UniProtKB/Swiss-Prot annotation:
A motif (Nuclear localization signal) lies at residues 19-35. GO terms for biological process: female gonad development; interstrand cross-link repair; male gonad development; male meiotic nuclear division; regulation of CD40 signaling pathway; regulation of germ cell proliferation; regulation of inflammatory response; regulation of regulatory T cell differentiation. Residues 1-20 are annotated as: Disordered. It comes from the Eukaryota. The keyword Cytoplasm applies. It comes from Mus musculus (Mouse). This is Fanconi anemia group A protein homolog. Keywords: Cytoplasm, DNA damage, DNA repair, Nucleus, Phosphoprotein. DNA repair protein that may operate in a postreplication repair or a cell cycle checkpoint function. May be involved in interstrand DNA cross-link repair and in the maintenance of normal chromosome stability. InterPro entries: FANCA, FANCA_arcN, FANCA_helical, Fanconi_A_C, Fanconi_A_N. It is found in: Nucleus; Cytoplasm. The lineage of its organism: Eukaryota, Metazoa, Chordata, Craniata, Vertebrata. Belongs to the multisubunit FA complex composed of FANCA, FANCB, FANCC, FANCE, FANCF, FANCG, FANCL/PHF9 and FANCM. In complex with FANCF, FANCG and FANCL, but not with FANCC, nor FANCE, interacts with HES1; this interaction may be essential for the stability and nuclear localization of FA core complex proteins. The complex with FANCC and FANCG may also include EIF2AK2 and HSP70. Interacts with FAAP20; interaction is direct.
Length: 1439
């Protein structure tokens, strides 16, 4: 024992102050004595007897588990009861000790043990380290005491009542956990403990204080949460079951009424404490922690199975009433002014959590009924009432109709009995519900118009109802926000004309109030929404919002927003005083103009910015650039720091939402948390939220890969990451079809913000450029997001994905997301498979139909990928029947995407889907997708790709009927589709790097050569089939399918009325030419049938050359070498197949002279490349000279080459061929040599000189258009001048070249030798040669004045149309304005010198064109009407 004298002796002093231990003293005696079992038993009995008569029971119990006690403990005796025979002696010792003690004291043993045990428990709880919880050491001691107590209870040696009474004597030192341990170890129950307390009030206070401390520990995340939560749950169950038990409960007849009163009092105190704490707006106080720990008890799961349903309903109904009526100190006027601060998002999250839990247990219908009852019968706390209404409509969509019905009944009652309270209640509830946005409740403006804007409104019964309404609205004026008065003014109630004074009186009152508040109706913002819940913004801040919105709309549309245009006219004061100063705020202008600069410049050009204001703005910007603020960096840093706080709140809200995903019991509060996320998102975006994307007709995205601001990208990445994490968390518990509607709510939140374009931009970056680097969770999450965006497609605007290619048109969101998935390379194709597999699987699991959720293009891409990657999918297979589509394996870490894709392909549900034509992969779809493939980065090898093409074309699509997207066995149809899709691909934004001289490698890639090879193979098969199967008696061969495709596509493109259209048409023609070069050359010539020596059918090719290629694919007066050589190769091939090759060649080339002469001039230019091919093949095949027409071309070339020599042969016929050859020969000759050649022109025929002058004019115009070399231009001018001099010297009229028409029998064919642009620019050539005209030519030829005036008027029209604009002008060329000035002076000097007969047809010439130059026109008319002696100038100087 602690006071043993032997121990003190053993520890006494020794010779050197050292004391021996008891063991050391007995060491020697132990060795000397022999072991005697009988003596050992006697010693043990003597020791027990000594303890029995000298034991202090209180000290004994406290001694249990003392660390310093090395002797046998009481707990150890109990622990060994079942282990050895000494357990009976241990139990006997405990009982004997208490019996002996009770016998000496004369008290019952149960009372003694209870008192001793109570004092021991109190001693354990002394000096607690925690208000309600035991320390680890205290817990161990109490565990041993509980074991002793249970042993005594089993022997009927323990009085529970006495124990409880003894405990309460020192209640201030008792710990709640000790009481709980007594209850859980069945020593005494909580009910017994509470029932035995002598003072109900004191017991209630003690329990309230301990519950609050316990909740503080729960809210602060204590180290033993299981214990604390079990304690709180058990106590609450007891309080609810005893405080709200029904009167039919038989226990109420035998139990006193004191415990129910205490239970009710404690619950009310805790709720009142929570409401008071939340009203004080706590942050991180202990009271707030206590409230956060207490709120979760308001859940039906807490008392499930323990408390009866009636008791639970009674408790929650009582709780809702207490919430609504807690401290009703706010007046109605206070509620009208303050209710905007009580919206769901602005209310403390713990209070909304409390509302949500209570309302969820009661149900929407009962909750609305309880609200009605409380509002009618009691005074209420308007803050709690209105915040409860917000929670009701936000968290319980089914309650929205109930609230609308409630409001309707209140309004009907108000106007029936003129009940003002009902009117007040209805308006407050409506305004509160509208604070939550249009997705929850109609806007206040819409409700007000619906209620009072028609003849069926509540107020339309009588004059008394009108007076009642306007009296009520007038009473609201001093208290309500300006926003509501504006709604009443802009959307007034419908009032009969005889009572119109009531309305005007109210409007006057409201306008006066608005004026007092300094809110002007004229200064309402351009984009201000009268239905929004916020206050009227200051004009400056509203102007800032208007400017931001205007810039955003301008950036999307490229046009001045209509509200800005209207404001510049009808709301001039606001526009000039507020909008323009905000828009034109001085700043350092960016090097690359941003949308703000572009909008300002557009407004300036439209005269919407006064010059003085604009000049001041430019000067201020220049000053700002010179005085660059040094603190710009710090200002940006401050702005970034300010943005971090709302972003952190948004992150926290998203984390709370993810936590709810993993708890199925919390699904009821998910919608509330999504609303919190929406509010935090609004805070991050600031004023940029425009109330929803529904107001936008189209979203226009930039083509640049990184156009997001840093904050926007951070927010978007946060939202997308949260969505993916939420999906994985929710799917780890339940499949998609059993999940809560969190995803729909989340996506609607994204759709309702101005951030939606940023979300779509980020999705484009991720799916198009970073798809292969995304993890499995990201792929699954983004695929599910795409599905839900498709579900919301009706409420989303269309997307214009490319501002550089507006002709592509806008896309709905599902089609836009589908356009982001490409199949060009191995990585992109595999990512496309993964994404499509995830999206289709999720959609089939989540919904019953795919029609509204996914783009048909995505389904088709999935088919394309599966058929391409898996040969086993190409063979018919029996569909797999399963209860559901396999979604769960996809979100496992080791997802086998290929196996999942094949499994989905074989599912009967998916195969059933493919029976719908909308989702079936047709031949045209297959070609479009296959054109995207880049063979060098393809997942298939060359042989595998070839086999796949052969299977797809010849086994799948060629024999398939056209109704199923096939070709119906028609090779021509297969070729037509290939050609059309190749051309579409070449014109689309998927292809780039076009150049006129490049091969048909679409998009600058080699990926299309395989498809071109398939086209060549099919075209060759088609040519063989058509050659061997000619209809009997058919003399006119059918047109080639290729020209039919070209003709149809070119007709679809309008004539080039703009530069963009012209370029598109030119690009289309380049594609046509390249396809012609890829196919056999016989396509150009057509070819006679076997055994028929007739001319081949070249009409379609001639028509294409004359109408299209001559204008867009032509170098001056010739076609390009490739198409020219290709034509002659085709001609040779047709000749080789005919009976008389020379006849076919001669007839074809003779036809070219009249129908398509540009082919012959092209052959002359490229003769050096063409002659070896023609001569070599002709000699090898026929061993005979060239046909006559080919020799004519050969002779023309020889004539041009030997023109300067004395032995030059005479010019061959026709003269224009010789002239063309001569003109082309001079291209490569130096200027000095050309002069020598020109001296020999006098001996040539007139026809040759006229044609040569025409070709020289075309060369001059080509030098103007190309602008490559000034020397070449001077050379061209010299040639024209020399030829013109020769013509005038020989007195050959050349004016006819400037008046050519196709009906001209002699020279009309020359118009087919040059592009139309060159012939339109002949006036430019005419006056470029002004200095070359001889002095007498003007007077000598009567037609000269007519031609000169006509050319001048046409030159003016060319200048007006912009066709004289050149990239640069050399000094020798001069500018178009200078040329027009010279021409004008020339005419004004020429007109007086011309004889009267020169003006005979001048009236017709000036008809409709006289206003182009009034001075010239007047001079012509006066000279025409003047006498012969009349003269304007005595001595004209023409040159």
């Amino acid at each position: 024992m602690p006071g043993s004298p032997a121990r003190g002796a053993a520890m006494g002093g020794g010779p050197r102050g050292l004391r021996k231990t008891w063991t050391e003293l007995l060491a020697g005696r132990v060795k000397k004595q022999k072991y005697d079992p009988e003596r050992e038993q006697k010693l043990k009995d003597s020791a027990l007897k000594l303890l029995r008569y000298h034991q202090n029971m209180h000290d004994l119990l406290l001694e249990v588990e003392e660390p310093q006690c090395k002797r046998l403990r009481l707990s150890e005796l109990i622990d060994r009861d079942s282990a050895d025979a000494s357990s009976d002696r241990s139990a006997s010792f405990i009982r004997s000790a208490f019996r002996d003690q009770a016998s000496r004291l004369g008290v019952p043993v149960g009372v003694l043990s209870a008192k001793v045990f109570a004092r021991s428990v109190q001693q354990v709880c002394v000096e607690p380290s925690h208000p309600v919880l035991l320390s680890p050491e205290q817990s161990k001691k109490l565990s041993s005491l509980l074991m002793i107590a249970r042993h005594l209870l089993a022997q009927n040696m323990f009085s529970r009542l006495t124990f409880c009474q003894e405990l309460w004597k020192a209640q201030n030192s008792l710990l709640l956990e000790a009481m709980w341990r007594l209850h859980t170890h069945s020593v005494v129950s909580l009910q017994e403990l509470l029932q035995s307390h002598p003072d109900s009030e004191a017991m209630a206070m003690w329990l309230f204080r301990n519950l609050r401390s316990l909740c503080e520990q729960i809210g602060a995340s204590c180290p033993s949460p299981d214990t604390t939560e079990a304690m709180l749950s058990g106590l609450v169950q007891l309080l609810i079951s005893r405080g709200f038990q029904g009167s039919s409960d038989p226990r109420r007849l035998v139990e006193p009424e004191r415990l129910p009163q205490v239970a009710t009092d404690v619950l009310q105190r805790m709720l009142a404490f929570s409401l008071d704490t939340l009203e004080a707006d706590p942050q991180t106080t202990l009271d707030c922690q206590a409230v956060s720990g207490w709120i979760p008890i308001y859940s039906g799961h807490t008392c499930c199975g323990v408390v009866t349903e009636n008791s639970l309903k009674s408790f929650f109904s009582h709780t809702l009433t207490q919430i609504l009526t807690h401290k009703p100190v706010l007046k109605v006027s206070d509620a009208i002014q303050m209710q905007k601060e009580w919206s769901f998002a602005k209310t403390h999250h713990l209070l909304t959590d409390l509302h949500c839990r209570v309302l969820a247990t009661l149900g929407p219908e009962e909750s609305v009924g309880r609200l009605q009852e409380v509002l009618e019968m009691q005074e209420v706390n308007w803050q709690h009432v209105l915040s409860c209404v917000s929670t009701l409509v936000v968290c319980f969509p089914e309650a929205q109709q109930l609230v609308k019905g409630w409001v309707a009944s209140l309004m009907a009652r108000a106007f029936e009995s003129y009940h003002l309270d009902s009117m007040v209640t209805a308006f407050l509830i409506v305004r509160q519900a509208t604070l939550e946005g249009p997705y929850v409740f109609p806007s206040y403006a819409d409700w007000f118009k619906e209620s009072f804007g028609s003849s069926h409104g509540y107020h339309s019964c009588s004059k008394k109802t009108l007076v009642f309404l306007f009296k009520f609205l007038s009473d609201l004026v001093p208290w309500e926000a300006p926003r509501y008065m504006q709604v009443h003014i802009f959307h007034p109630p419908l009032v009969p004309s005889k009572y119109h004074s009531l309305l005007t009186d109210y409007i006057s009152l409201a306008k006066t109030r608005l004026a007092d508040l300094k809110v002007s109706l004229e200064n309402v913002g351009l984009y201000e929404d009268l239905s929004s819940p916020g206050d009227i913004a200051e004009r400056e801040s509203q102007a800032v919002q208007d400017v931001k919105k205007a810039i955003m709309v301008f950036e999307q549309t490229g046009k001045i927003p209509m509200p800005v245009l209207e404001a510049s006219i009808f709301r001039r004061p606001y526009y000039v005083s507020h909008f323009l100063p905000t828009l034109l705020a001085p700043r350092v202008l960016p090097e690359v103009p941003d949308p703000r600069v572009a909008l300002i410049e557009t407004l300036k050009r439209a005269d919407k910015i006064p010059s003085s204001i604009y000049d001041a703005y430019r000067k201020a910007c220049a000053s700002a650039e010179k005085q660059q603020p040094e603190n710009a960096t710090s200002a940006q840093r401050t702005e970034a720091d300010c943005a971090k706080e709302p972003l952190g709140l948004l992150t926290a809200a998203l984390e709370e939402l993810r936590a709810l995903m993993t708890d199925p019991t919390q699904y009821s509060v998910i919608s509330a948390q999504v609303a919190v996320v929406s509010e935090k998102l609004n805070a991050v975006l600031g004023h940029r939220n425009d109330g929803g994307s529904l107001q936008r007709a189209k979203i226009q995205l930039s083509v640049l890969p990184s156009t997001l601001q840093k904050q926007d990208q951070a927010v978007v990445d946060l939202l997308l990451t949260a969505f993916c994490q939420n999906l994985m968390a929710a799917s780890s518990f339940v499949p998609p079809e059993r999940q809560s509607p969190w995803a729909v709510l989340f996506v609607r939140t994204l759709c309702g913000h101005v951030l939606l374009p940023a979300v779509l931009t980020r999705l484009r970056q991720l799916l198009r450029h970073q798809g292969q680097s995304l993890s499995t969770s990201h792929v699954l999450g983004l695929a599910a997001l795409a599905v839900h965006l498709g579900e919301c497609r009706s409420m989303l605007p269309e997307v214009d994905p490319d501002v550089l290619a507006p002709s592509a048109g806008s896309l709905c969101v599902p089609d836009f997301l589908n356009s982001l998935l490409t199949c060009r390379t191995r990585d992109s194709l595999l990512f496309c498979m993964n994404f499509c597999t995830a999206a289709v699987s999720y959609c089939l699991c989540k919904f019953s139909a795919l029609r509204n959720c996914l783009s048909p293009g995505l389904i088709k891409k999935f088919q394309f990928v599966v058929l391409r990657l898996f040969p086993e999918a190409r063979a018919p297979c029996a569909p797999e029947h399963a209860a559901c589509v396999p979604w769960r394996p996809l979100y496992l870490p080791s997802a086998d995407w290929q196996r999942a894709a094949l499994s989905l392909w074989r599912r009967d549900s998916f195969q059933e889907l493919l029976k719908d034509k909308e989702f079936y992969l047709t031949y045209r779809d297959w070609v479009q997708l296959e054109l995207e493939i880049q063979p060098e980065a393809d997942v298939l090898s060359d042989m595998e790709r070839h086999d796949f093409h052969q299977w797809a074309i010849y086994e799948r699509y060629l024999p398939a009927p056209t109704a199923l997207g096939g070709c119906g066995g028609d090779l021509e149809e297969a070729c037509t589709v290939l050609v059309s899709e190749i051309m579409d691909f070449h014109q689309s934004s998927r292809s780039y790097n076009h150049s006129e001289d490049s091969d048909l490698v679409l998009g600058g890639r080699t990926g299309n050569k395989d498809i071109l090879s398939r086209l060549q193979e099919i075209a060759l098969d088609l040519e063989l089939d058509q050659g061997s199967a000619v209809p009997h008696g058919c003399s006119t061969p059918q047109s080639h399918f290729l020209f039919r495709v070209f003709r149809r596509r070119l007709q679809a493109l309008a004539r080039p009325d703009s530069m963009a259209t012209s370029l598109r048409r030119q690009q289309e023609l380049l594609t046509c030419k390249r396809l012609l070069l890829c196919l056999p050359p016989s396509v150009l010539v057509g070819g006679p049938q076997a055994g028929q020596p007739i001319s081949p059918n070249c009409g379609e090719f001639f028509s294409l050359v004359n109408s299209e290629l001559r204008n867009f694919c032509c170098h001056g007066s010739v076609l390009t070498s490739d198409i020219t050589i290709h034509f002659f190769r085709g001609l040779l091939r047709v000749c080789l197949r005919s009976q008389d090759p020379a006849l076919v060649a001669n007839q074809t080339l003779t036809e070219c002279q009249t129908k398509c002469p540009v082919i012959l001039t092209s052959a002359l230019l490229w003769w050096s490349s063409l002659e070896p091919v023609l001569c070599g093949r002709w000699m090898r095949c026929y061993q005979s000279p060239l046909p006559r027409e080919l020799r004519r071309l050969q002779e023309a070339r020889e004539f041009a080459s030997n023109f300067a020599s004395a032995s030059a042969s005479p010019a061959p016929s026709p003269a224009w061929i010789a002239a063309a050859a001569l003109h082309f020969a001079w291209r490569g000759v130096r200027k000095e040599d050309v002069t020598a050649h020109l001296q020999r022109l006098d001996c040539q025929r007139e026809e040759l000189l006229i044609a040569l002058f025409f070709f020289s004019l075309m060369g001059l115009l080509s030098s103007y258009l190309t602008q490559r070399d000034t020397a070449e231009h001077l050379k061209a001018v010299d040639i024209c001048a020399e030829v013109l001099t020769c013509l005038e010297r020989r007195k050959v009229s050349w004016l006819v070249l400037f008046q050519l028409t196709e009906k001209d029998a002699k020279l009309g064919h020359l118009l087919h030798l040059a592009p139309d642009q060159h012939t339109r620019l002949l006036p430019l050539a005419f006056y470029s040669l002004l200095s070359c005209f001889s002095e007498g030519a003007a007077v000598r030829e009567a037609a000269f004045l007519h031609v000169a005036v006509d050319m001048y008027l046409k030159l003016l029209q060319l200048f007006v149309d912009g066709e004289t604009r050149l990239q640069g002008h050399s000094e020798s060329q001069g500018s178009p304005v200078q040329l027009i000035t010279k021409a004008r002076v020339f005419l004004l000097q020429l007109i007086p010198q011309c004889p009267k007969q020169c003006f005979s047809n001048m009236t017709e010439l000036l008809a409709g064109r006289g206003d182009c130059d009034p001075e010239v026109s007047n001079a012509l008319r006066q000279r025409q009407q003047a006498d012969p002696s009349f003269d304007l100038y005595q001595e004209p100087q023409l040159f």
